[in-house]
Amino acid sequence: MVWKRLGALVVFPLQMIYLVVKAAVGLVLPAKLRDLSRENVLITGGGRGIGRQLAREFAERGARKIVLWGRTEKCLKETTEEIRQMGTECHYFICDVGNREEVYQTAKAVREKVGDITILVNNAAVVHGKSLMDSDDDALPKSQHINTLGQFWTTKAFLPRMLELQNGHIVCLNSVLALSAIPGAIDYCTSKASAFAFMESLTLGLLDCPGVSATTVLPFHTSTEMFQGMRVRFPNLFPPLKPETVARRTVEAVQLNQALLLLPWTMHALIILKSILPQAALEEIHKFSGTYTCINTFKGRT
C-alpha cells in the first residue's frame, strides 16, 4: 500500500507536466473541430445581442437545427427568419427561463416538435445596474432567477437525455464579472458568480459521463444594448468586445471541447492579480481603470 501511494505521488506531477505540454501544443497546432451537422442547438435569450450572433454562428458552421428561447416574440421572429434564410431549420419558443414550470413545459414542447437537444447554450441574462442600497427588492429575485436558477432548470430539463444519448454539451455565457465584481451591478455580479460556481461543479460532475461536456465563457464588457452607456477610463486600451467575436469564439470553444474561455485572453491576468495582490492594490486598479465608476453612466436594457 505504501509503495502504491509513493508511486502515485511520482506519477501525478508527471501527469501534470504532460497535460500542460499537451495544452501548450494545442495552442500552436490547429486542432480538429467538432462536426455540428448532427447537432440540435438551443439558445436561451436567442432573439438579440449575443444570442442572435450565436444562432448565426452555429448556422454558418452547419448545425442541424437551432431553437431559440426568449421573452420578446418580435426579436425571436426576426432571428428565426434570418437563420431560415441561411438554410438552417430554426424554431422559436416564448419562454421565461426565470419561471421553473415554464422551462419544463417548454422543454417538453421542444422535444415533441424538434427532437432531442444536444447543445444547450444558457445565454439569457438581465442586469439592473443598481447598487445594493438603490436596488429594488422585487427586482433582485428576478436577476437571480434568470441569471442563475434558470440555468439549473434548463440543464435539468435537457441533461438527462444527453446522458442517455452519450452526446451533449452545456454552454454558459457568463461574464468576467463573475471573477471580479464592480460596484453598481451587485445583483448581476452576484448571480454571475453563482452561475460560475454552478458550471464549475457541473463540469467536474461530467468527468465520468462519456460524450457529455461543458463550456463556460467569461467575456469582458460586450457592445450590446444590454450594457449600453457603460464606460471605462481607457476605452482604446480596454475596448468592448463585439458580439460577433464572442459568438465566434464560443462556438469554436464548443467544437474544441474547451472547458473555460476568457475573452479577451488578457483576462487571465485578472485571475493572477487577484491571487497575489493585496486588496488595497486591487482597489487602486479598479479606480485607475475606471471600473470603479463604469456603471454610473449605465442606461442599458434590463
Swiss-Prot record:
Keywords: Lipid metabolism, Membrane, NADP, Oxidoreductase, Transmembrane, Transmembrane helix. Pfam families: adh_short. Its EC number is 1.1.1.300. The chain crosses the membrane at residues 9-29, 170-190, 195-215, 253-273. Coiled coil: none annotated. It is a multi-pass membrane protein. Its main location: membrane. In the retina, expressed in cone but not rod outer segments. Catalyzes the reduction of all-trans-retinal to all-trans-retinol in the presence of NADPH. Belongs to the short-chain dehydrogenases/reductases (SDR) family. This is Short-chain dehydrogenase/reductase 3. It comes from Bos taurus (Bovine). The lineage of its organism: Eukaryota, Metazoa, Chordata, Craniata, Vertebrata.
